[in-house]
Amino acid sequence: MKIIIQRVKKAQVSIEGQIQGKINQGFLLLVGVGPEDQEEDLDYAVRKLVNMRIFSDAEGKMNLSVKDIEGEILSISQFTLFADTKKGNRPAFTGAAKPDMASDFYDAFNQKLAQEVPVQTGIFGADMQVELVNNGPVTIILDTKKR
């Protein structure tokens, strides 16, 4: 899994002009699933996300997790995180998991995440418009194969 984590003040995702998911303070996640991803990748990602201390405490130190601040997560599927740009000018996406596997894995990821913190999502495979207000900005890349 490859996940882009953005600390946000608020975020929302719309599909065909209708708001699908909306959060206040927390994380906007762009989530890519790879063909080799297993349940251990899912477990690792969830554990890291809910415990990652990148929110400021009373002294202004990044010392609090999304759980600590009672934040929310907006999770968006993003196969383009597996883009291969080595050849030519058009990215290849053959490094991403096949849609059926990726959709099931993405759903399982969101369900497990929702056991820890409130989660809103987009719709897998849909053309989505994502709006956010970055907080910081703080943007972190989590790759479950690099641990």
From Swiss-Prot:
Its EC number is 3.1.1.96. GO terms for biological process: D-amino acid catabolic process. The keyword Hydrolase applies. The keyword tRNA-binding applies. Gene3D superfamilies: D-tyrosyl-tRNA(Tyr) deacylase (3.50.80.10). One of its GO terms (cellular component) is cytoplasm. Belongs to the DTD family. An aminoacyl-tRNA editing enzyme that deacylates mischarged D-aminoacyl-tRNAs. Also deacylates mischarged glycyl-tRNA(Ala), protecting cells against glycine mischarging by AlaRS. Acts via tRNA-based rather than protein-based catalysis; rejects L-amino acids rather than detecting D-amino acids in the active site. By recycling D-aminoacyl-tRNA to D-amino acids and free tRNA molecules, this enzyme counteracts the toxicity associated with the formation of D-aminoacyl-tRNA entities in vivo and helps enforce protein L-homochirality. A Gly-cisPro motif from one monomer fits into the active site of the other monomer to allow specific chiral rejection of L-amino acids. This is D-aminoacyl-tRNA deacylase. It comes from Streptococcus pneumoniae (strain P1031). The gene is dtd.
